[in-house]
Amino acid sequence: MIQTPVIVTFANQKGGVGKTTLCITFANYLVTKGARVVVIDCDFHHSIMKCRKADIRKYGEQEMPYEVWAYEANDKAMMTSLMEKLHNDPEIEVVLMDSPGSLKAEGQIPMFVNSDIIIVQFHYDLVTVPSTASFLMFVERLKKAVGERMKARLFIIPNLND
């Protein structure tokens, strides 16, 4: 039996690989299957939150298919508190987290450690592949450093390939 909520983080230190797009696409899919979803926008650009605000301006305050919360990934203590809150919320089945395209945000440590699934998108080019490899090495070092506290399953997904 899967324990809910399931926290899925879309991550890569390389920007432009499709983290935000895949996060929203997955949120929309899960909602059509009846899941109670919350999207946490931790990307520095807060693109998901900006789109949600634009939707509200255009369509009004009608019921949205899922909530979007914006958080800064720079604050480690705040992110630790958020992850604890999410893990203890019985109203949520799936949390989708859009992480920043950088490893400079200290809040990413508790984000990754407390995720159930980390999805790493990349595309095949001379810049993205080495950057993604570096990110994957970071995740492996983090797993070794925190031990069994980090139970996240890692999925590596090629994106934007022909």
Regions found by a protein language model. Give the residues of each.
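Hydrophobic positions on the alpha1 helix immediately C-terminal to the Walker A/P-loop
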Residues: 21-22
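Short coil/loop residues immediately preceding or within conserved phosphate-binding loops
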Residues: 5
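Conserved catalytic-core segment of NTP-binding enzymes
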Residues: 38, 100-162
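Conserved beta-strand position immediately N-terminal to the Walker
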Residues: 8
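P-loop/Walker-type NTP enzyme "switch/lid" segment
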Residues: 2, 11-13, 17, 28-102, ...
